[in-house]
Amino acid sequence: GFLTAEEKGLVNGLWGKVNVDEVGGEALGRLLVVYPWTQRFFQSFGDLSSADAIMHNSKVKAHGKKVLNSFSDGLKHVDDLKGTFAKLSELHCDKLHVDPENFKLLGNVLVCVLAHHFGKEFTPQVQAAYQKVVAGVASALAHRYH
């Protein structure tokens, strides 16, 4: 596996305290605010006219929750991310034509949100482990492009 046993422990230890629904909506919302060009994939989501509108948009929250539940699933199969995300990779790459760079951006935003929520608990070691995970997930999602 690409994570050491210690890194897995750090990742799972923190993940057990994550409110997946809340953090998912916040991460996706921030992605759309901070990197506005990502909004073009969400035109059917209604009002994305301001940061406030985005952060309170129920469709953004719902999709963010879905995204983070998939991520949660990935953490259970961290040694087979390609397999775990094969179907989602197909959907996002072949059908939706999402630029794979966006998966990396969302991963980095997720790390920011976790740091924001957990403060001192989000140590450099924990961050390093999470950066590895989000990079692995982004790469698994971009798999169909390679």
From Swiss-Prot:
Modified residues (S-nitrosocysteine): 93
Entry keyword Glycosyltransferase: no
Origin: domain of life: Eukaryota
Record domain Globin: where: 2-146
PTM annotation (N6-acetyllysine): residues: 59, 82
Annotated heme b binding sites: 63, 92
Gene3D superfamilies linked to this entry: Globins
GO MF annotation: an example: metal ion binding
Tissue: Red blood cells.
InterPro entries the UniProt entry points to: Globin (IPR000971), Globin-like_sf (IPR009050), Globin/Proto (IPR012292), Hemoglobin_b (IPR002337), Hemoglobin_oxygen_transport (IPR050056)
UniProtKB keywords: Acetylation, Heme, Iron, Metal-binding, Oxygen transport, Phosphoprotein, S-nitrosylation, Transport
Biological process, per Gene Ontology: hydrogen peroxide catabolic process
Function comment: Involved in oxygen transport from the lung to the various peripheral tissues.
Subunit (UniProt): Heterotetramer of two alpha chains and two beta chains.
Family per similarity comment: Belongs to the globin family.
Protein's name in the database: Hemoglobin subunit beta
